[in-house]
Amino acid sequence: MPLKKTLSAVLFSGAISVLAGGAVNVHAQDAESQVVPSAEDVKEEAQANTKYLAAEALKKARAVLNAHGEFAPFGAGLFQDGQVNFVWAIKPGESTQGINPALVLNAVRTSLFTQAKTGRILASAVVYQYQGASSEGDAAMQVNVELEYLNGYAEVIATEYVQGADGIEYTTSGRREFDPSIFTEAVIE
């Protein structure tokens, strides 16, 4: 009797080993068949996703400017499913009188940093109004969008705007790279 139990146990454990070995083997084959994206593919994905996020952020800024004439700095996060969620320290339509824009920017950045650190977002946008100078040297209002992506890609887009007959109209824009503040090395690693 004990021999039968031992033999059954050996056969049973052998079957488990064969099944487990097969599963490990299939898993290894799946891992080998996965394509590792090239650096160029990653760069293209980052640019496509940040372009999409920038368009959504500028659309939201225009809507808020048309409705309220101004806005406090706000943020946007791009989730893995393509959804964009906005971060408001001061909700649209609330008074911006007496606010400290630096504190509001810090609150928005902190919220986005937390989302980035936990891996919830792929990209972030920090959006704020800025009074710059046009190419002719005149004062010009602009919407700045600081874009960042999880691979460390970071650029700011400055888009000038004017009040047109049908509301806010974006005119010219420029862009440049900057040091990331959301997807920092602490988040990327």
Stretches with model-predicted labels:
Residues 11, 15, 65, 109-112, ...:
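Generic secondary-structure transition motif, activating predominantly at the C-termini of alpha-helices
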Residues 1-12:
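Bacterial N-terminal signal peptides that target proteins for export
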Residues 11, 73, 142:
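Broad gene-expression machinery/nucleic-acid interaction feature
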Residues 16-25:
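C-terminal segment of classical bacterial N-terminal signal peptides
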